[in-house]
Amino acid sequence: MNTNKQKYEYFPGTIVLPSDTYDTKNHQLIGRRVAGKQFLEGITSNLKDEEIINIIVYSEKEVHELKNILEKAGINLNRINFNIGLENINLNKIENIHIAGPDLDQWSIIRSGFRRNLFSITGVIHTLSSTAVIKSIKDYLTGGLESWDSLVCTSTSGKKVVEKIIDFHHQELESKYETKLSKKKYPKITTIPLAVNDITYQRNLTREEKRSISRIKLEIPKDSLVILSLGRLSFNSKYHPLPLYRSIAKLAAKRPNLNVILLECGSFYNDNIKTNYDNLIKSIKPLKVIRLGGIKPATEKEKIDALNASDIFLSPSDNIQETFGISVIEAMAASLPCIVSDWNGYKDHVKNNENGFRISTTQLNNLENKID
């Protein structure tokens, strides 16, 4: 009898991860997919020695994609059970199903015919501005969810939005049926911020050494002032670049002996958006812009070099879906001082005049004063 045989137990959570939630290579590079990939790598690299985790995907292709990502991250694939759908999942042996979105109620139907407390269902918010997301939260009131299910909000502002959606529709139901309704059966709404890995690596190097190496790679003069804009390049779903461009041009004009460079690292959704950005840059003098990415998204290595090469991170976001802002956390992880708009999820990360600066969206044309 082999007494040394390893005994394994399952990680309590079964994770649902279709490729749309983490694949930044074959899908548009946006924050929720970056967060999904970080979550995937984080949870699979921190299993206990005796744990195995169940991951649910929707196709063989997604299994292959997941394995490639995890192998590159150095994850032991023997610790992961890849399941296409629920066919091979024993519902009596799981404690939780976690999805990378807020549509919890569509998963409650699989508890039909079982004890309602057989397992919990959890999810996480990303954008909250779409009609589909608002409807999925509205369904919490009339579907099969219970108080032991939970939606994780990544910021205080995100939690407030979810609570307002629930309260509005709760009052609507009370008015319709002319009765007082209990909230005891609603899922728990909690706040847990997103996290990132140590994405700049090379812990044996100082911040200055990393900056020097990356600037050589990117052909940026070592005495430059490099201001980083990281993330989606979109004037409607992130921020309009005009205030940023004008402010950096004003700083460059004010400090002619300082080589001020805006380093854009991200992706455009289409050629039309790219053309508009390029034309705007040409119209503003003096403005120097180096761009990593574009129609083809910046690679992970390019992002790391951008973070390492920069002096300041700046994000004047003013869109209606900035529930968190993972690029701010990435910048902080790279030891960059942050200047951001006083906006939604950013308020949780950046404490004004403590670990960065927050600027009102009505004063973004004066960003150069904070940079200076």
Task: Describe every region a protein language model picked out.
Residues 60-144:
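Extended catalytic core of nucleotide-activated donor transferases of GT-like folds
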Residues 71-74, 264-266, 274-308, 312:
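Nucleotide-activated donor-binding/catalytic signature segment of Leloir-type glycosyltransferases, i.e.
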Residues 91-92, 298-310, 333, 351, ...:
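Short acidic alpha-helix that forms the nucleotide-activated donor recognition element
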Residues 146-213:
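Donor nucleotide-sugar binding/catalytic pocket of nucleotide-sugar-dependent glycosyltransferases
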Residues 183, 205-226, 253-257:
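Nucleotide-sugar donor-binding and catalytic loop/hinge architecture
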Residues 221-238, 245, 262-264:
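Conserved donor-binding/catalytic core segment of Leloir-type glycosyltransferases
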Residues 305-321, 336:
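Acidic donor-binding loop of glycosyltransferase active sites
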Residues 337-340, 350, 357:
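Short hydrophobic beta-strand element within catalytic cores of glycosyltransferases
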